[in-house]
Structure formats: structure tokens, C-alpha cells
Design a protein with these regions (language model features):
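Extended basic (Lys/Arg/His-rich) segments that typically form rRNA-contacting surfaces
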Residues: 1-243
């Protein structure tokens, strides 16, 4: 499987070679830096860890800072963190060497299992891993809508607007029976927080690949607002019929 981290830039329309106008979403897919390659012998499974987009170093959490220092483009680097087992000058030397290690601040990190490309820590990959005509799945977070009622959140029809409705136009109505079963059934559609949830859109066709700018033009819409981060991976379910 091949995958990348990217950012949604916006939507537009392009014309295909046969003159069809197609709605596409522009995704900045890279460059992705290979941070770590996990193996069965060392980690228990095969995976490739990719990083995308820069960040101010002072905004890095201590955990991410330590991870980036330990995996800064070196496959077999074993961090010698200054622990209690090392005393005196040796411990101080370890501390100075650890603090002096340069890091590249990275905002987004994600693992891809069963990565089909032969890459090593320190390598950089981009949109050219895909080709026009490939089908991909795009994972992103839907736009947050805040607390919403059942009409907007679940597309309820609402109550009558007249004939003595008494203000029930957008209310949910009954949420269950009485003493039997005596509780609200699990999964009942009710008002609540809408959006800001992970969503996957499958089998989107790549219309164009602009490798120089690391841009993918994907047919249709993808989750999230402009500027949101997304994951683009090789489609798991190949479309049965394509036009």
C-alpha cells in the first residue's frame, strides 16, 4: 500500500482530454519525510512513519521533540538518553550530545503499514508516487458545526408549522416508549455535537498529478475545510465499474 500526508487547498474545475468538465479537489501531497521504518524484528510489525509540514521548534511537545531527535534520518540510531545508570562526566557528555542533536520540526506524523515503496529514513517522497487514473481513499476530519439540533444534524422532518403545533417545529419529539423498555435505546438520534469527526471517502480518481508542485487533483469532494490535513492512500476497494 502507498500513502501520503497532505493538505486540502480547495476545489476547482478542470477539463479532461475528451472535453468533459470535472470538479476536483486540489491536495498538496508532500513532500513527506521518511522518519522511521519499523520492522518485525525490532517493533513487531512492518510500517513506515512519514512526517509532513513544518512547525516552529518551540511549539513541539517534549515527546515529539525526543522522537524526532531519535529518528532524525538515521535508521539504526539508538538514543543514549542520560539516565541514572550513567554517572559523572559520561552522563554529562551524553546529555550534551543529546541536546546538540539537530532536528527538523514536523507538525504531522503518521504510520503506514505494509508500505510498498522501498524507502529509508531521511528520504523524501511526494505526489509522484501516484499517477493519473489511480484510485485513492482520502481520510480527513469533517467541518465542525458545534451543537446542533436533530433537523440539521440528522435531517429530521420536524413538526407541523401550524394547526396548534405549539412551537414543535424543530423539536425531536418522543425519544422512546414508557416502562417497556424503560430506557432510551442506544444510538437514538438526538441533538449534540455535529462534525469534527474522521471521515473516509473511497475510490476517488486522480485526474492530474503535478509532481513539480506536489499537487494532486482528485475527482470530487473530500472531508474538511481548506487548509485541513488529510491522508491519501491507495484505494483498498477497487471500483467494479469505471467510466
Amino acid at each position: 500500500m502507498v500513502g501520503l500526508l497532505g493538505k486540502k487547498l480547495g476545489q476547482t474545475r478542470v477539463y479532461t482530454e475528451d472535453g468533459r468538465s470535472v470538479s476536483v479537489t486540489i491536495v498538496q501531497a508532500g513532500p513527506n519525510q521518511v522518519l522511521q521504518r519499523k520492522t518485525v524484528g525490532k517493533d513487531g510489525y512492518e510500517a513506515v512513519q512519514l512526517g509532513f509540514d513544518g512547525q516552529k521548534e518551540q511549539r513541539l511537545s517534549l515527546a515529539k521533540r525526543g522522537h524526532l531527535k531519535a529518528h532524525n534520518g538515521e535508521e539504526n540510531y539508538t538514543p543514549r538518553s542520560p539516565g541514572r545508570t550513567v554517572k559523572g562526566k559520561a552522563r554529562l557528555a551524553n546529555r550534551k550530545a543529546w541536546d546538540a542533536r539537530a532536528i527538523t520540526p514536523i507538525r504531522r506524523i503518521k504510520e503506514f503499514r505494509d508500505f510498498s515503496l522501498d524507502v529509508n529514513p531521511g528520504d523524501s517522497i511526494g505526489a509522484d508516487v501516484f499517477e493519473a487514473g489511480d484510485y485513492v481513499d482520502v481520510i480527513g476530519k469533517s467541518k465542525g458545526r458545534g451543537f446542533q439540533g436533530v433537523v440539521k444534524r440528522w435531517n429530521f422532518g420536524g413538526g407541523s408549522g401550524s394547526h396548534g403545533s405549539g412551537g414543535w417545529r424543530r423539536r425531536p419529539g418522543s425519544i422512546g416508549a414508557g416502562s417497556t423498555p424503560g430506557h432510551v435505546i442506544k444510538g437514538k438520534h438526538m441533538p449534540g455535537h455535529m462534525g469534527q469527526a474522521s471521515r473516509t471517502v473511497q475510490n476517488l480518481e486522480i485526474i492530474q498529478v503535478q509532481a513539480d508542485d506536489n499537487l494532486l487533483l482528485v475527482k470530487g469532494a473530500i472531508p474538511g475545510a481548506n487548509g485541513d490535513y488529510v491522508v491519501i492512500r491507495e484505494s483498498k476497494k477497487k471500483p467494479k465499474k469505471t467510466k
